[in-house]
Amino acid sequence: MFSISLLSCLFLGTVPALAQTGGERRLSPEKSEIWGPGLKAHVVLPARYFYIRAVDTSGEQFTSSPGEKVFQVKISAPDEQFTRVGVQVLDRKDGSFIVRYRMYASYRNLKIEVKHHGQHVAESPYVLRGPVYHENCDCPLEDSAAWLREMNCSETISQIQKDLAHFPTVDPEKIAAEIPKRFGQRQSLCHYTLKDNKVYIKTHGEHVGFRIFMDAILLSLTRKVRMPDVEFFVNLGDWPLEKKKSNSNIQPIFSWCGSTESRDIVMPTYDLTDSVLETMGRVSLDMMSVQANTGPPWESKNSTAVWRGRDSRKERLELVKLSRKHPELIDAAFTNFFFFKHDESLYGPIVKHISFFDFFKHKYQINIDGTVAAYRLPYLLVGDSVVLKQDSIYYEHFYNELQPWKHYIPVKSNLSDLLEKLKWAKEHDAEAKKIAKAGQEFARNNLMGDDIFCYYFKLFQGYANLQVSEPQIREGMKRVEPQSEDDLFPCTCHRRKAKDEL
């Protein structure tokens, strides 16, 4: 996907730079803009990133691509002979670019040069005065308030406030005894304790493989910031668990999906979390890669709605049925049968998977529940198609911030008005395009990697403040071992060294 070399730069695409004179627009290196968290030494992310906005010589911003190779990016460590950094320049096709880079070692300082035809852009070169730590470096900032400021985290997050409002207090002693009794035999749970910035776990139930996603984000957080001592339970299953109607004796359980019929505390989904941790690693679908693969411009997109997936909900069967009746409006098909195998002859045959990026050849994306909320919604929103979202009792951590008719087109849960909504979108093309743009902006501004880290920390911080007894390393718990250091490029934490010298 990318190479690592002495100075690693990767550029996507082959469109030449715009450098014409005369009546053509000319890109201005001086007036173009560069900003973002990847220019700050102390913002540690698995893949750091910043933005470039192309501006012409008259000061006007480009609103379409000025060419995918107009900017050249070089990242180096002036004090080192070798620099292990993978770099990608992603053209968002709207006049802006994401530059993302993944570090495989830590450096005293880091120099970022952005050029256009050999000329520095904006205030390039940018020097990150370090140490600048890579993702696997265990060097937490002790001052969590300072970390929150560096990360530019929101003061309050409404979904967290709503979820925690069900629990005026939390007693770790009580939940340690009661939750395993109530849920431990029938469900898949992880009992975690964070103590002295170390992670401990005890699993309950048979199918606990998904703990790897929770282990990974907790270890990543503890490498970056001093986490509060906290004890909690994570539901590894699809469905939210705490369904008691009254507040009496409800249990705080963390889940990746919430519902209007449950009281679970919602976290970012394991899918979105994993895509953040593995950006420029083992995943190819993430919130940044989508932005560089949004297909043709709106006017050139296919005017049918597209959907692919498995048969995990009866409404999906209805969608495929609608597609067969109205192929001029909907292109929907199953890629796998599992839940309704006996109906495969009616709703099959199954079709081959298509690249997620190929979805954006279509103007209209249908988001419909699977077993719970469809975890693809963040990626659909950050593309440049308009999303038709099914009404649902299920929600992810950000749904309460979305507004129907502003960020997406709502569709009734039984899909009875889907055809009507599609026809509306076709007849109101400019309005549909505006909704697509608003949804995209929401995802760009709220669902990036730093937003996910902020959400997790604020959630655990708020939960820890409710505890009325001290979290404990319970009987049967084992430490979640951190990743071993790279012997070739070890991490030397200056914070730990300074603390040891006190």
Swiss-Prot record:
Please state the pathway this protein functions in, per its UniProt record. Answer: Protein modification; protein glycosylation
Which keywords accompany this UniProt record?
Answer: Endoplasmic reticulum, Glycoprotein, Glycosyltransferase, Signal, Transferase
Q: Name one GO biological process term.
A: protein O-linked glycosylation via serine
**What's one Pfam family here?**
Filamin
Motif Prevents secretion from ER mapped to chain: 499-502
- Where is the signal peptide, in residue numbers? 1-19
The post-translation modification note in this UniProt entry reads: N-glycosylated.
Q: Which PROSITE patterns match?
A: ER_TARGET, FILAMIN_REPEAT
Protein known as: Protein O-glucosyltransferase 2
Q: In which organism is this protein found?
A: Mus musculus (Mouse)
For this protein's source organism, the top of the classification is: Eukaryota, Metazoa, Chordata, Craniata, Vertebrata
